[in-house]
Amino acid sequence: MSVVNFYGQLSNTQQFDQIRINIASPDQVRSWSFGEVTKPETINYRTFKPEKDGLFCARIFGPVKDYECLCGKYKRMKNRGITCEKCGVEVTVSRVRRERMGHIELAAPVAHIWFLKSLPSRISTLLDMTMRDVEKILYFENYVVVDPGLSILQKGELLTEEELQKAKDKYGEDAFTASIGAEVIQQMLKEIDFLKLKQELYEELQTTSSEVKKKKLVKRLKLVEDFLESENKPEWMIMDVLPVIPPEIRPLVMLDGGRFATSDLNELYRRVINRNNRLKKLIESKAPDIIVRNEKRMLQEAVDALFDNGRRGRAAKNANKRPFKSLSDMLKGKQGRFRQNLLGKRVDYSGRSVIVVGSELKLHQCGLPKKMALELFKPFIYSKLELYGIATTIKAAKRMVEAEKPEVWDVLEEVIREHPVLLNRAPTLHRLGIQAFEPLLIEGKAIQLYPLVCAAFNADFDGDQMAVHIPLSIEAQLEARVFMMSTNNILSPANGRPIIVPDKDIVLGLYYLTLAFDNEVGEGMMFSDLAEMEHALYNKFITIHTKIKYRRNQLNAEGKMVPVIIDTTYGRLMVGELLPSNPNIEFKFINKQLTKKDISLVIDLVYRHCGQKATVIFADQLMKLGFKYACSSGISFGMDDMVVPESKSTHINETQLEIKEFEQQYSNGLITYGEKYNKVVDAWSRCTDRVANDMMKEIATPPVSDDPNHQKINAIYMMAISGARGSFQQIKQLGGMRGLMTKSNGQIIQTPIISNFKEGLTEFECFNSANGMRKGQIDTALKTASSGYLTRKLVDVAQDCIITEKDCGTDKGIEVKSVIEGGEVIVPLAEKILGRTAAIDIFHPVTNDLILNKGELINEAKLEQIESAGLDRIMIKSVLTCESTTGICSICYGRDLATGTLVSEGEAIGVIAAQSIGEPGTQLTMRTFHIGGAATKGAEVSSVEASYDAKVKIISRNVVINSEERKIVMSRNCELLLLDNNGNEKARHKIPYGARLLVDDGDMVIKTQKLAEWDPYTIPIITEKSGKVLFKDMVEGISIRDVTDEATGIPSKVIIESKQYSRGAELRPRIQLLDAKGEVIALSNGLEARYYLPVGAVLSVEDGVQISVGDIIARIPKESTTTKDITGGLPRVAELVEARRPKDHAVIAEIDGRVEFGKDYKSKRRIIIHPIDETMSIEYMVPKGKHVVVNEGDFVKKGDLLIDGNPVLQDILKVMGVEVLANYIVKEVQAVYRLQGVKIDDKHIEVIIRQMLQKVEITDSGGTTLLAGEKIDRHEFEEINEKAIKNGLKPAEAQLILQGITKASLQTRSFISAASFQETTRVLTEAAIAGKIDKLRGLKENVIVGRLVPAGTGYFMDKMRKAAVKLDEENV
């Protein structure tokens, strides 16, 4: 017996390994067919029987009723296989009407619209004509010269009717041949000799130098090669015969009232048949040419409408003016075959109902209404009733169940025992949206859900509904129990943190329980056991908040119990009792006021040290305790709890005075409108924060009172600080001031809302506020869709990313260090490397001991060693550098975040990555409005303070001392580092050009000491020498103009876009410095002291004045800032993963070198970089209005910005390489999510980046058959090169290219997956021509063909089956 049969027989429809798609030849279409459809009739209106030779003909397609011919001569099974001589129908099952096809012999050839109109048009590419021209021939507008003969006409030249007539008159009737219609196109395609054409194109490609031509040739060559490889004939793109799909797939259904509902396809087929028959008649009766031609054109249009209605010309519409649904429409879009029926099927054995809280349940249980369970488990109940002899037949069992006999309930209890059910809440944004539970039968009609799983489902109990699904087979039950049971999904796959965390009221209850108050009854009493304390509490000697001393036995590291005396409260001890005993989980972790964060950390600890079971029990008990005390605390709040601070009016008055001063400065012309705007917004931001801080102080410490019933802590404060509900943002609006609001375009309104909700808003404030809130609401609605679309694109690009082996053996890795922004460590190194594997052996920098072996997983214990060693950067393995050919290896991926262990083979990490990135997107967009449009804008940073006691190190220090003896930074890339005693970097700050340095290299500084300060709203231009100012090229009204401010009447000189000056001379406004002799001063780098001024710069000096070193000669105002919230964020994430060019993108230097400004060209500035080794210099042309961040003579490094903005990803890849690119994308995406407090592991983003970097572009074909400019898969490229080297040929060269996720999805190796994503017709057209083969490697294509996905258990079955086949072959 063969081994492979052990794994169960594959059904007939599943015995294939790959799927190939081709163009069908006319003979193939005829071979599928069971007969020609010649009549447009469908069924007889009286007898309702199909008409003979019509679209539903029983002779062609099979009998209407099982085993019964049409005329009724043969009935019953016994006549199976007989063909009735009277009506010609074969006696068989009526199911064949779903399989049998027919055909229509067309009277004239017709072009297939997909190959004609689907861009790029294949027919026109092959014939080397424009699509417009091909259409003119096909639709009988123009003739084409097939054979010029004796005339001087060109082959392939188009002629109108008149031109043809003229040519005939000129050269004679038979001098040349010109023809029209699909026949001529078919003939021209037939005549193509591919091998010859390929050679010609190849030679032309070698000789041509034009880039445009090259691109065109490569496209044509690719198409020719596709045809050669697939053995498709080009003339098959023109059809002589049309397939008719089986009638059951385009049904005609009778409605009550004698009317019929029919599929649109029947109508479209009828039009084709009618026109075809008419054409046949016309040809037979030798009708005039013009009539025949018109009929042929109409036939072409009818076939076009059948295949793809509306693609060309006006769509064919039905009586109600609704376009017919053609064959293409059946496949396309959300309602098409792929997405509606193949990827998303409806499921039987399912029910749905409203959910309610099941606080008495255990984590692995859910309450299922009895009625629902009875319906869902029917088949199981029937079989059990029969098995026990309670019912004799299935019918009897059915009756018993319908009557709801008492014994049925007993059987139901037994059937349900340990049979898990799946609960799902839509939208299912990540895999935790479907989990398995064991059902408990309950009365009522609502499903009961365990409260702690709400976070994973994002469910609340305000009327949410959930669906129940029943896993039927034993394998399905097993998978549900092992993989999907809620107890096995404690950690979130997105970030590895517990997702079963108490929330809302539970958190509030636990916070209340762990509060400790001063001066409570019985403070300082000593206890040694809990019973004693309970007694004291019962008799009111203490309260749960009294500070007491307690002797507690604790496990030490050796595993012995040691008594320790701790200061605590009874409430905290109650939580402490629930902790599992483990030396790593000390009482100190909960001996504090427990907030949501603390509870989460404790649950994490328990999971890491005590395992899953202990965690589940601990979380469950915490929940019960939290609910109990949330109830008995009786926390509520009223108006008095919203405290308005006394100092509010003082702060507001101060700010108003400040703003008056800004207005004054503005009216005196000292600052521009933009600067004033920024300063005003900033001042109000600070004021709002100050008011909020004062309010927080007042709320946090309620007034002291002798009243024993006095509230010791503010309820609102408690809710916010514990993390139960609300944020300080919202409390600020209740009791402080609402602060600044945004306009609908995202700009901040200068006048803030001074009132809060307690005092109430004025009419004007209310209007502004409503405006901001409305924006939030609209954003929410719009962003939900775009976020869902982003998730879909991400899943599609990453769906075939699966762990396929343990170790790929690569030595490569990426270097990571902690993320430092504004001198603060935002993401410590520890967080970035936890759960990754080391790429090299890692040693202690001082003692040189080995900390980690290469390829070893970095777990919590190793982290502590790395942190104590003070390492600040580490090489880790990454999916970006993994060298597995299919999929990714476990070692490069690292820890599976949902289990905390090394990822196992077969895990679908691509989908998990996509869900982890996409899910919070939707979450966040649903949450923009919680702040209600209040602007959240931090005041601009204008100085740097030391965050530690440390030593200063300054990188690229270029400083001048100005007239006030201040140190002014002149370098564009100055950085200030703070180092600890070992010389490790603790913080890093970028110091902008023009800042005042308050410390110097090598200084020791103390914490909070100011290091540097600057004006955040303008970019200054500063002199580095003293001298006399000379204005150059500043022509009033042309390159410079006095801008008189309307409000103040004060003129200031501003550089404007220079218009054409006399005789096209370019104006380049600049300031030169002259010495006493009137000559231009030379700078330290040998260049002359010239300062070019960009458009928009405001001059700070007059012509001819004397200035000294470090003075500001002009200011460039910065744009005023708009608010940041995730709506800015989601499009940013999409922009990154789609690899789009950002609007106003930066320009980056490709080499190290010195900057020089060349001669301007029209509206562009020319920046030239001269490398040090004086090789080729590189020029950049940039628009004049853009702000150039470098000065003439500056030295730039490769990758530095020349122009401000977000860099283009493709540039980063080209200049800096994959690692820098990956770091940049990860950093940017993380910044968006971090703003919202969402944590996603870096590796998920890396998986997506890996998928974006799958293709290479050939730069030099070497000795291979590849073409320069062709884009192919990375692994394919490596295989081709290996072959070339084996055969002694020169290998090809290529460069990695970055593709956006949509493009990458459409170019996957699997055409089925690509077709089901987007642009279905285009993908299928392309695949059919190339005769593509789908190896069915990814998840989507397997779902579509109805198999188990090759991930998880399916992956192992696949693996075992392959091994079994191998064994069988060996045995044979």
From Swiss-Prot:
One of its GO terms (cellular component) is DNA-directed RNA polymerase complex. CDD domains: RNAP_beta'_C, RNAP_beta'_N. Coiled coil: none annotated. Keywords: DNA-directed RNA polymerase, Magnesium, Metal-binding, Nucleotidyltransferase, Transcription, Transferase, Zinc. Mg(2+) binds at D460, D462, D464. It catalyses: RNA(n) + a ribonucleoside 5'-triphosphate = RNA(n+1) + diphosphate. Gene3D superfamilies: 1.10.132.30, 1.10.150.390, 1.10.1790.20, 1.10.40.90, 2.40.40.20, 2.40.50.100, RNA polymerase II, clamp domain, RNA polymerase Rpb1, domain 3. The keyword Metal-binding applies. Its EC number is 2.7.7.6. Its cofactor is Mg(2+); Zn(2+). It comes from the Bacteria. GO terms for molecular function: DNA binding; DNA-directed RNA polymerase activity; magnesium ion binding; zinc ion binding. GO terms for biological process: DNA-templated transcription. It holds the Pfam family RNA_pol_Rpb1_5. Zn(2+) 2 binds at C808, C882, C889, C892. Binds 1 Mg(2+) ion per subunit. Binds 2 Zn(2+) ions per subunit. Zn(2+) 1 binds at C69, C71, C84, C87. InterPro entries: DNA-dir_RpoC_beta_prime, DNA-dir_RpoC_beta_prime_bact, RNA_pol_asu, RNA_pol_N, RNA_pol_Rpb1_1, RNA_pol_Rpb1_3, RNA_pol_Rpb1_3_sf, RNA_pol_Rpb1_4. DNA-dependent RNA polymerase catalyzes the transcription of DNA into RNA using the four ribonucleoside triphosphates as substrates. Belongs to the RNA polymerase beta' chain family. The RNAP catalytic core consists of 2 alpha, 1 beta, 1 beta' and 1 omega subunit. When a sigma factor is associated with the core the holoenzyme is formed, which can initiate transcription. This is DNA-directed RNA polymerase subunit beta'. The gene is rpoC.
